[in-house]
A protein has these predicted regions:
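Lipid interaction determinants
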Residues: 20-91, 106-154
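Bacterial Sec-dependent N-terminal signal peptides
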Residues: 1-24
């Protein structure tokens, strides 16, 4: 009788733990996706995409654009001075390599002139709420897909 009672108790505890493991695993998966980890976006096409990053400072606003066309990339920096209202820009071109969710950008031409130190970025492709993002691995800056941004603004 005791063995039967312990056996049933053990069996019930095992089933309870399995149910908790399933819900805990779902929660961890959602958290990983929110962080950008454990997403399988190999089939997402980023060709002909434009990503935007805007940073506001006290004296100026910085807008950065990453435009991807095939294996080439155009990286544009636009600086808007708040005091004078003037804008200046730098247009870099280069190449891009993508392995799964990681995107490596190397822009070594500034307005068709080779620069000694190219602009390099290592970016993680993520998707949250059906919006594509590129997250800078080093700085944690987030570029949003302009197409997704313009859809939500309409």
């Amino acid at each position: 009788m005791r063995k039967l009672l312990f056996g049933m108790l053990f069996f019930g505890a095992a089933l309870g733990l399995k149910a908790q493991y399933g819900s805990l695993n779902d929660i961890l998966t959602r958290l990983e996706e929110r962080k950008g980890i454990n997403q399988h976006l190999e089939n997402v096409n980023i060709d002909n995409k434009k990503f935007v990053f805007i940073k506001d400072f006290e004296d100026h606003t910085e807008r950065d654009f990453i435009i991807i066309k095939g294996n080439t990339v155009t990286y544009v920096e636009v600086f808007d001075d708040k005091a004078s209202g003037e804008s200046s820009s730098n247009v870099f071109t280069g190449d891009i390599i993508r392995k799964k969710n990681m995107v490596s950008l190397r822009a070594n031409m500034l307005e068709n002139k080779k620069v000694p130190i190219p602009v390099t970025k290592t970016l993680l492709l993520t998707k949250q709420d059906n919006i594509l993002y590129l997250i800078d691995v080093n700085k944690k800056d987030r570029w949003i897909d302009e197409e997704s941004f313009s859809k939500t603004k309409k």
